[in-house]
Amino acid sequence: MPLMTPPTCLPNVNTRQDYVRIYRDADVWLPAMQAICQRHGLDATQLEFAPPGTHIVFRVRPDRYIKLFSPLWGEDFVPERLVLCQLSGRSDLPIPQLVAEGEIEEWPYIIVTAVEGVSLDGVWRSMDASNKEYIAARCGELMASLHSTPTEGLETIAVDWPDFVERQIQNCIDDLIHADIDKQWIRSVLEFL
């Protein structure tokens, strides 16, 4: 009897263009997220796509997130996992706690707790100046606390700043293209960056 290959639940992504083309299509990622939920005893009926970002993120109601790392940027998995472990248990920082990790079809993933709050994207414009000042001050306090964290154990994280900056610029442009922003405006942003 011939060996049968198991069905795949993730798309074949070989290039950045492949990834960008399907990134925002939640239905593409749902089978993998359902499989991860089943593997870890989470309710797969409570999945909610949670872009934007470089990697695929779904919220599992009520209080978990699954982050799936594309093999194109698989090197992002280890540093994120190490930093989450390093910051675990800090009561002064609202940090997601690492619940589980694994791999599905050679795509690494983590499951973390949700940090309550709202995205500034949705509320910043409607906030008055005093609230914005409070948030800015609080962000400064959080950054100071984060920067005071010992870095022992994080030495293996290699940071190629030119590559990182280039990826951030490309991600920005991709987001603008997907938001259907005028191409002339995108060119202006690219010149600025």
Report residues per predicted region:
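ATP-binding pocket architecture of kinase catalytic cores
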Residues: 45-160
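A generic structural signal for ordered alpha-helices
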Residues: 7-15, 35-36, 44, 76, ...
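FAD-dependent flavoprotein oxygenase/oxidase catalytic domain
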Residues: 4-6, 15-18, 90, 95, ...
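Short N-terminal secondary-structure initiator segments
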Residues: 2-7, 48-65, 170-173, 177-189
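An alpha-helical support segment within catalytic cores of ATP-dependent transferases
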Residues: 24-42, 116, 132, 136-137, ...
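Short, structured coil/loop segments at alpha-helix boundaries
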Residues: 10-12, 71, 90, 128, ...
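Phosphate/pyrophosphate-binding loops and the adjoining catalytic core of nucleotide-dependent enzymes
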Residues: 2-33
